[in-house]
Amino acid sequence: MAVTGPEIERLIALLSKLPGLGPRSARRAVLQLIKKKETLLGPLAAAMTDAMAKARICSACGNVDTQDPCAICADELRDPHILCIVEEVGDLWALERAGAHKGRYHVLGGVLSALDGVGPDDLNIGRLVERLTGGEVREVVLAMNATVDGQTTAHYITDRISGLGISVSRLAHGVPVGGELDYLDDGTLAAAMKSRRPF
């Protein structure tokens, strides 16, 4: 039984489809939005309308921006010789927040997964190979998550580009900054030992 009008129920149902928001969290979010109708709900609705009208997928790298090519691909100060390959746009944004990469990116749009039926043709791998055969890229940084599917995808890409004469590196795996050894899982500790370097 609905306890409120259909418009509000629809908003709750739509919000609950977002990652990390179930029906209960969506209900709380909607109640907060309605309480702050003028200062939050109205501006949010306007921002969503603007984003819907202006958001674009970059035809070069797969990033989300309001321009195509995106601001990163259009930035002439970026090193065009280093290409960082990520699974999703959120991974690209995380690396940008960290200020850790000064080259360009390529978003795959997921990972290879036999269980989920995701193969190479379902990802942005064909476009990646096109970019790499252009001759400008000298190094590829594989920034996949440290999951079985992430590592499978990294190995697949390495095999696909092996004859192009491009150096391939991957992100280090191991102890996070501020991490305590006693709280880390065995796999992380093993990866940290294998990835150790001189101090």
Swiss-Prot record:
Transmembrane segments: none annotated. GO terms for biological process: DNA recombination; DNA repair. Coiled coil: none annotated. It comes from Parvibaculum lavamentivorans (strain DS-1 / DSM 13023 / NCIMB 13966). GO terms for molecular function: DNA binding; zinc ion binding. This is Recombination protein RecR. Gene3D superfamilies: 3.30.60.80, 3.40.1360.10, 6.10.250.240, RecR Domain 1. Keywords: DNA damage, DNA recombination, DNA repair, Metal-binding, Zinc, Zinc-finger.
